[in-house]
């Protein structure tokens, strides 16, 4: 059963990320109990997900039930959650870097602006790595920028990490973002 659940979870994530591109999805958490499937969607713009009078949520639920072949409609529950700060979500920050690189903006400038924005939002540290044919160069290279502290060997720190490829006109550029949100209460 575990194998089927993992495949189903991947399908759910894929469908939701595809459907909610403009809503700014930063994280999708899936909880399963014996007869319930709860999907928590962390969104920057919940209005796009919910729609007028909750119609968007109902449509999304019907679409997921159809795609996943769920027989009982009460099994699936979608719970939208609002993100306090979009600049503290590594996925949304990386997505903004990707969009700017695709628009052919200078990689150095993009990294500097993003680092300033994230640090102003209240992060303890941030690190961005771009690798590939940056700026359409013939020889691939790796660019790194960091600010604040980024202790990657410490389990007490809440570090958000994501890696996303950016398809530019001259090829792929890998974008990696680490954001240190501070210490976690254990």
Where are these regions (language model features)?
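RNA-contacting regions in translation and RNA-metabolism proteins
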Residues: 1-186
């Amino acid at each position: 059963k575990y194998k089927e659940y993992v495949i189903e979870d991947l399908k759910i994530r894929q469908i939701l990320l595809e459907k909610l591109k403009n809503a700014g999805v930063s994280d999708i958490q899936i909880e399963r109990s014996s007869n319930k499937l709860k999907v928590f969607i962390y969104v920057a713009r919940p209005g796009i997900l919910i729609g007028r009078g909750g119609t968007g949520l109902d449509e999304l639920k019907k679409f997921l039930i159809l795609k996943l072949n769920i027989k009982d409609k009460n099994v699936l529950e979608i719970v939208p959650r609002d993100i306090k700060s979009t600049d503290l979500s590594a996925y949304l920050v990386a997505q903004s870097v990707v969009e700017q690189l695709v628009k052919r903006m200078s990689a150095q400038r993009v990294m500097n602006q993003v680092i300033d924005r994230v640090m102003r939002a209240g992060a303890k540290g941030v690190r961005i790595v771009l690798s590939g044919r940056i700026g359409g160069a013939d020889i691939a290279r790796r660019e790194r920028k960091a600010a604040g502290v980024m202790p990657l060997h410490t389990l007490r720190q809440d570090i958000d990490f994501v890696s996303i490829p950016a398809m530019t006109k001259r090829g792929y550029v890998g974008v990696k973002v680490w954001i240190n949100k501070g210490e976690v209460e254990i």
